[in-house]
Every structure is written in C-alpha cells, then in structure tokens.
C-alpha cells in the first residue's frame, strides 16, 4: 500500500513555514495556485473533494507565514479528525516543525515524516 499522506503533509507544512512574513500579491497568488495544484494532485479523488470543501469553508489566510501555518495545521487536524487519527495542539505542531527545521539546517536531514507519520 502506498503511503502518500505523510509526504504530502510535509510538503504542505514546509511551504507554509517558508512562506513570506510580508508576502506580495504575487506571492499570495502563487500560494493559492500552489494549494489548488496540491489538492488536484492528491491521488485520492475523495480526498480531493474533502480538501476543496475544506478550502471553500475555510479560505486560506495568507497575511504571513504564521497565519498560513495555522491554516495548514487546522486543515491537517480536520483530516485527522475525519480519519479518527490523533489531533495535536498548536504548540505540538510548532514543536514538531520547528525542531525538524533545526535538524534539517543543522544536519541536512529531516524527521518530519517520523514526527507525524502516525497522525
């Protein structure tokens, strides 16, 4: 069985983390396009439907990286809730990704997938 979810989540969260803290209109537009392409690329049509539905009900917040990260965090928890997987707090999310970013920078590798692989 192909476990594509953790890799998709990792790319989504990383995009939000490295998003600008003062994005231009062009950067916001590119982020919207990236999210739409991200959703369309999901290998599960039911997942695509749920993601588009979530996006419609919870529009992207692209004022800065923190807002965008919070949107991805809430989206991930929404999916986990629907799948009866663990829901994490905002502080847990920040710890997982901030620590993983530091490991990536320091050691040239990451443990993002290990951190949330069971979620």
Curated annotation (Swiss-Prot):
EC numbers on record: 1.8.3.2
Record-linked InterPro entries: ALR/ERV, ERV/ALR_sulphydryl_oxid_sf, ERV/ALR_sulphydryl_oxidase
Disulfide feature: 44-47
Domain ERV/ALR sulfhydryl oxidase: 1-97
Transmembrane regions: none
Known cofactor(s): FAD
One GO location term (cellular component): host cell cytoplasm
Keywords: Disulfide bond, FAD, Flavoprotein, Host cytoplasm, Late protein, Oxidoreductase, Virion, Virulence
Location of the protein in the cell: Host cytoplasm; Virion
Enzyme class: oxidoreductase
Induction (free text): Expressed in the late phase of the viral replicative cycle.
Catalyzed reactions per annotation: 2 R'C(R)SH + O2 = R'C(R)S-S(R)CR' + H2O2
PANTHER family: ALR/ERV, FAD-LINKED SULFHYDRYL OXIDASE ALR
Self-association and partners: Interacts with A151R.
Protein name: FAD-linked sulfhydryl oxidase
Organism name: African swine fever virus (strain Badajoz 1971 Vero-adapted)
């Amino acid at each position: 069985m192909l476990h594509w979810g953790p890799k998709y989540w990792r790319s989504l969260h990383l995009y939000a983390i490295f998003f600008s803290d003062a994005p231009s209109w062009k950067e916001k537009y590119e982020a919207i396009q990236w999210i739409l392409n991200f959703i369309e690329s999901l290998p599960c049509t039911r997942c695509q439907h749920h993601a588009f539905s979530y996006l419609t009900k919870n529009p992207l917040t692209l004022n800065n990286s923190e807002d965008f990260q919070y949107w991805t965090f809430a989206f991930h928890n929404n999916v986990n809730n629907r799948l009866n997987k663990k829901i994490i707090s905002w502080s847990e999310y920040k710890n997982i990704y901030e620590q993983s970013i530091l490991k990536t920078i320091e050691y040239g590798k990451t443990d993002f997938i290990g951190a949330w692989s069971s979620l």
